[in-house]
Amino acid sequence: LEAELLSQNMHFSELSSGKTNQTELVALLITQGKDFVEGIENVYQKIKGSCSMLLLTEDGIIVARDKWGRTPIVIGKKEGAYAATSESSSLPNLGYEIERYVGPGEIIRLRADGMEQMRAPQEGMQVCSFLWVYYGFPVSCYEGKNVEEVRFLSGFKMGQKDESEVDCVCGIPDSGVGMALGYAEGKGVPYHRAIAKYTPTWPRSFTPANQEMRSLVAKMKLIPNRAMLQGKRLLFCDDSIVRGTQLRDNVKILYDYGAKEV
Protein backbone atom coordinates (compact mmCIF):
# COMPACT_ATOMS: atom_id res chain seq x y z
CA LEU A 1 0.00 0.00 0.00
CA GLU A 2 2.84 2.38 0.81
CA ALA A 3 4.45 1.79 -2.59
CA GLU A 4 1.08 2.16 -4.33
CA LEU A 5 0.38 5.51 -2.67
CA LEU A 6 3.89 6.80 -3.35
CA SER A 7 3.49 5.88 -7.03
CA GLN A 8 0.42 8.14 -7.02
CA ASN A 9 2.57 11.03 -5.76
CA MET A 10 1.16 10.80 -2.25
CA HIS A 11 3.41 12.16 0.50
CA PHE A 12 4.18 10.62 3.91
CA SER A 13 5.41 13.01 6.59
CA GLU A 14 5.19 10.87 9.75
CA LEU A 15 7.19 7.88 10.98
CA SER A 16 6.36 5.44 13.76
CA SER A 17 9.22 3.23 15.04
CA GLY A 18 11.10 3.94 11.83
CA LYS A 19 8.21 2.89 9.61
CA THR A 20 5.43 4.69 7.80
CA ASN A 21 2.79 5.84 10.27
CA GLN A 22 -0.23 3.57 9.81
CA THR A 23 -2.68 6.30 10.79
CA GLU A 24 -1.32 8.57 8.07
CA LEU A 25 -1.53 5.74 5.54
CA VAL A 26 -5.20 5.16 6.39
CA ALA A 27 -5.84 8.91 6.21
CA LEU A 28 -4.39 9.04 2.69
CA LEU A 29 -6.65 6.17 1.63
CA ILE A 30 -9.65 8.11 2.97
CA THR A 31 -8.69 11.22 0.98
CA GLN A 32 -8.98 9.20 -2.25
CA GLY A 33 -12.76 9.13 -1.89
CA LYS A 34 -15.07 11.94 -2.97
CA ASP A 35 -16.47 12.03 0.57
CA PHE A 36 -15.86 10.37 3.93
CA VAL A 37 -18.07 7.36 3.21
CA GLU A 38 -16.38 6.58 -0.10
CA GLY A 39 -12.97 7.16 1.47
CA ILE A 40 -13.69 4.81 4.38
CA GLU A 41 -15.02 2.19 1.96
CA ASN A 42 -11.70 2.52 0.13
CA VAL A 43 -9.96 1.65 3.40
CA TYR A 44 -12.22 -1.39 3.81
CA GLN A 45 -11.25 -2.57 0.31
CA LYS A 46 -7.51 -1.91 0.53
CA ILE A 47 -6.62 -2.96 4.07
CA LYS A 48 -6.01 -6.67 4.59
CA GLY A 49 -7.34 -7.28 8.07
CA SER A 50 -9.36 -5.08 10.40
CA CYS A 51 -9.47 -1.31 10.61
CA SER A 52 -12.02 0.44 12.80
CA MET A 53 -11.70 4.19 13.13
CA LEU A 54 -12.96 7.41 14.71
CA LEU A 55 -12.59 10.57 12.63
CA LEU A 56 -12.82 13.95 14.34
CA THR A 57 -14.32 16.47 11.91
CA GLU A 58 -15.68 20.01 12.12
CA ASP A 59 -19.16 18.52 12.00
CA GLY A 60 -18.81 15.85 14.69
CA ILE A 61 -17.19 12.44 15.01
CA ILE A 62 -17.44 9.85 12.25
CA VAL A 63 -17.48 6.31 13.65
CA ALA A 64 -16.58 3.43 11.33
CA ARG A 65 -16.31 -0.22 12.34
CA ASP A 66 -14.24 -2.66 10.28
CA LYS A 67 -16.24 -4.53 7.65
CA TRP A 68 -16.01 -7.90 9.42
CA GLY A 69 -16.86 -6.53 12.86
CA ARG A 70 -13.73 -8.07 14.37
CA THR A 71 -12.98 -5.05 16.55
CA PRO A 72 -15.85 -3.50 18.52
CA ILE A 73 -17.20 0.03 18.68
CA VAL A 74 -19.94 1.01 21.11
CA ILE A 75 -21.81 4.32 21.26
CA GLY A 76 -22.66 5.87 24.61
CA LYS A 77 -25.22 8.57 25.35
CA LYS A 78 -25.93 11.08 28.11
CA GLU A 79 -27.90 14.31 28.15
CA GLY A 80 -26.53 16.59 25.45
CA ALA A 81 -23.69 14.33 24.38
CA TYR A 82 -22.66 11.14 22.58
CA ALA A 83 -19.43 9.18 22.83
CA ALA A 84 -17.81 6.34 20.88
CA THR A 85 -15.30 3.85 22.23
CA SER A 86 -13.95 0.35 21.71
CA GLU A 87 -14.47 -0.46 25.41
CA SER A 88 -17.83 0.12 27.10
CA SER A 89 -15.97 0.14 30.44
CA SER A 90 -14.92 3.72 29.67
CA LEU A 91 -18.53 4.97 29.71
CA PRO A 92 -20.02 4.59 33.24
CA ASN A 93 -17.64 6.87 35.15
CA LEU A 94 -18.19 9.59 32.55
CA GLY A 95 -21.95 9.40 32.98
CA TYR A 96 -22.76 7.62 29.70
CA GLU A 97 -25.11 4.71 29.11
CA ILE A 98 -24.67 2.24 26.26
CA GLU A 99 -26.85 3.43 23.38
CA ARG A 100 -25.96 0.87 20.72
CA TYR A 101 -23.24 -1.27 19.17
CA VAL A 102 -21.96 -0.29 15.74
CA GLY A 103 -22.42 -3.06 13.16
CA PRO A 104 -19.84 -4.53 10.76
CA GLY A 105 -18.88 -1.94 8.15
CA GLU A 106 -21.38 0.54 9.56
CA ILE A 107 -20.55 4.26 9.48
CA ILE A 108 -22.22 6.73 11.84
CA ARG A 109 -21.80 10.47 12.36
CA LEU A 110 -22.11 11.63 15.97
CA ARG A 111 -23.06 15.14 17.01
CA ALA A 112 -23.94 16.45 20.44
CA ASP A 113 -27.64 16.45 19.55
CA GLY A 114 -27.92 13.10 17.76
CA MET A 115 -26.50 10.51 15.39
CA GLU A 116 -26.80 9.89 11.67
CA GLN A 117 -26.22 6.58 9.90
CA MET A 118 -24.04 7.19 6.85
CA ARG A 119 -23.61 3.54 5.83
CA ALA A 120 -25.73 0.58 6.89
CA PRO A 121 -24.04 -2.47 8.45
CA GLN A 122 -23.35 -5.43 6.22
CA GLU A 123 -24.50 -8.98 6.81
CA GLY A 124 -22.26 -11.39 8.67
CA MET A 125 -19.79 -10.86 11.49
CA GLN A 126 -16.42 -12.36 12.41
CA VAL A 127 -16.01 -10.80 15.85
CA CYS A 128 -12.77 -11.64 17.67
CA SER A 129 -13.52 -14.30 20.31
CA PHE A 130 -10.43 -13.20 22.25
CA LEU A 131 -12.39 -10.16 23.39
CA TRP A 132 -14.35 -12.21 25.93
CA VAL A 133 -11.68 -14.78 26.72
CA TYR A 134 -8.53 -12.68 26.99
CA TYR A 135 -8.37 -9.05 25.89
CA GLY A 136 -11.53 -7.64 27.41
CA PHE A 137 -11.70 -5.67 30.64
CA PRO A 138 -14.10 -7.48 33.03
CA VAL A 139 -16.84 -4.83 33.03
CA SER A 140 -16.83 -4.30 29.26
CA CYS A 141 -19.63 -5.57 27.03
CA TYR A 142 -19.28 -6.62 23.40
CA GLU A 143 -22.36 -7.25 21.27
CA GLY A 144 -24.43 -7.15 24.45
CA LYS A 145 -22.39 -9.84 26.21
CA ASN A 146 -20.49 -8.89 29.38
CA VAL A 147 -16.89 -10.10 29.56
CA GLU A 148 -16.87 -11.20 33.20
CA GLU A 149 -20.25 -12.91 32.84
CA VAL A 150 -19.03 -14.96 29.87
CA ARG A 151 -15.88 -15.99 31.73
CA PHE A 152 -17.76 -16.81 34.92
CA LEU A 153 -20.43 -18.89 33.17
CA SER A 154 -17.80 -20.73 31.12
CA GLY A 155 -16.00 -21.69 34.32
CA PHE A 156 -19.27 -22.53 36.08
CA LYS A 157 -20.31 -24.98 33.36
CA MET A 158 -16.86 -26.52 33.33
CA GLY A 159 -16.94 -26.92 37.12
CA GLN A 160 -20.30 -28.70 36.95
CA LYS A 161 -19.04 -31.20 34.38
CA ASP A 162 -15.44 -31.75 35.51
CA GLU A 163 -14.84 -34.85 37.64
CA SER A 164 -11.32 -33.95 38.79
CA GLU A 165 -10.66 -34.24 42.54
CA VAL A 166 -9.17 -30.93 43.67
CA ASP A 167 -8.67 -29.06 46.94
CA CYS A 168 -9.10 -25.60 45.45
CA VAL A 169 -9.24 -23.66 42.21
CA CYS A 170 -7.07 -20.72 41.21
CA GLY A 171 -6.99 -18.35 38.25
CA ILE A 172 -3.99 -17.04 36.36
CA PRO A 173 -4.51 -13.26 36.59
CA ASP A 174 -6.03 -11.30 35.24
CA SER A 175 -8.47 -12.79 32.78
CA GLY A 176 -8.25 -16.35 34.12
CA VAL A 177 -9.73 -15.23 37.44
CA GLY A 178 -13.32 -14.85 36.23
CA MET A 179 -13.39 -18.39 34.88
CA ALA A 180 -11.79 -19.74 38.06
CA LEU A 181 -14.42 -18.06 40.24
CA GLY A 182 -17.14 -19.62 38.10
CA TYR A 183 -15.48 -23.03 38.24
CA ALA A 184 -15.23 -22.81 42.04
CA GLU A 185 -18.95 -22.14 42.35
CA GLY A 186 -19.92 -24.79 39.82
CA LYS A 187 -17.66 -27.40 41.40
CA GLY A 188 -18.34 -26.44 45.01
CA VAL A 189 -14.68 -26.00 45.95
CA PRO A 190 -12.95 -22.90 47.40
CA TYR A 191 -11.19 -20.28 45.31
CA HIS A 192 -7.63 -19.47 46.44
CA ARG A 193 -5.32 -16.78 45.11
CA ALA A 194 -2.22 -18.95 44.91
CA ILE A 195 -0.53 -16.83 42.27
CA ALA A 196 -0.44 -13.03 42.03
CA LYS A 197 0.42 -10.68 39.20
CA TYR A 198 2.95 -7.87 39.39
CA THR A 199 1.89 -5.57 36.58
CA PRO A 200 4.23 -2.51 36.59
CA THR A 201 6.66 -2.51 33.64
CA TRP A 202 5.63 -5.90 32.25
CA PRO A 203 3.56 -6.14 29.01
CA ARG A 204 1.50 -9.08 27.75
CA SER A 205 3.84 -12.03 27.43
CA PHE A 206 2.87 -12.94 23.85
CA THR A 207 3.65 -9.50 22.35
CA PRO A 208 7.50 -9.34 22.44
CA ALA A 209 9.15 -10.26 19.15
CA ASN A 210 11.51 -12.96 20.45
CA GLN A 211 10.97 -16.04 22.60
CA GLU A 212 13.64 -15.10 25.13
CA MET A 213 11.83 -11.89 26.05
CA ARG A 214 8.41 -13.61 26.02
CA SER A 215 9.72 -16.17 28.52
CA LEU A 216 11.22 -13.48 30.74
CA VAL A 217 7.98 -11.47 30.86
CA ALA A 218 5.93 -14.59 31.61
CA LYS A 219 8.27 -15.55 34.43
CA MET A 220 8.67 -12.16 36.09
CA LYS A 221 5.13 -10.80 36.19
CA LEU A 222 3.47 -13.80 37.91
CA ILE A 223 4.51 -14.59 41.48
CA PRO A 224 3.46 -17.88 43.19
CA ASN A 225 2.41 -18.02 46.85
CA ARG A 226 4.09 -21.03 48.43
CA ALA A 227 1.81 -20.96 51.50
CA MET A 228 -1.27 -21.46 49.31
CA LEU A 229 0.35 -24.11 47.10
CA GLN A 230 2.06 -26.47 49.53
CA GLY A 231 0.60 -29.98 49.36
CA LYS A 232 -2.54 -28.90 47.48
CA ARG A 233 -4.31 -30.51 44.53
CA LEU A 234 -4.85 -27.39 42.46
CA LEU A 235 -6.94 -26.66 39.41
CA PHE A 236 -5.80 -23.57 37.55
CA CYS A 237 -7.83 -21.70 34.94
CA ASP A 238 -5.53 -20.06 32.41
CA ASP A 239 -6.68 -18.29 29.26
CA SER A 240 -3.18 -17.62 27.90
CA ILE A 241 -3.02 -20.02 24.97
CA VAL A 242 -1.72 -17.66 22.27
CA ARG A 243 1.75 -19.20 22.32
CA GLY A 244 1.52 -21.41 25.42
CA THR A 245 4.35 -19.46 27.05
CA GLN A 246 2.80 -19.06 30.48
CA LEU A 247 1.08 -22.44 30.58
CA ARG A 248 4.30 -24.41 30.21
CA ASP A 249 6.35 -22.34 32.63
CA ASN A 250 3.65 -21.89 35.26
CA VAL A 251 2.95 -25.61 35.68
CA LYS A 252 6.63 -26.26 36.41
CA ILE A 253 6.79 -23.36 38.88
CA LEU A 254 3.69 -24.57 40.73
CA TYR A 255 5.25 -27.99 41.28
CA ASP A 256 8.54 -26.36 42.31
CA TYR A 257 6.64 -24.44 44.99
CA GLY A 258 5.10 -27.54 46.51
CA ALA A 259 1.84 -28.21 44.68
CA LYS A 260 0.83 -31.87 44.96
CA GLU A 261 -1.17 -31.97 41.72
CA VAL A 262 -1.87 -29.36 39.03
Predicted region positions:
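Conserved short alpha-helical segments that host acidic/polar catalytic motifs at enzyme active sites
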Residues: 1-104, 109-166, 172
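Short, well-ordered alpha-helical packing segments
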Residues: 2-6, 27, 44, 184, ...
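Secondary-structure transition/capping motifs at alpha-helix termini
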Residues: 12, 163-167, 185-192, 226-230, ...
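Generic beta-strand/beta-sheet core signal
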Residues: 56, 64-65, 76, 85, ...
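Flexible loop/turn segments at secondary-structure boundaries
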Residues: 70-71, 91-93, 116-117, 176-180, ...
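Short, glycine/charge-rich flexible loops or terminal/linker lids adjacent to PRPP-binding catalytic cores
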Residues: 188-234
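PRPP/pyrophosphate-binding module of the type I phosphoribosyltransferase fold
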Residues: 216-262
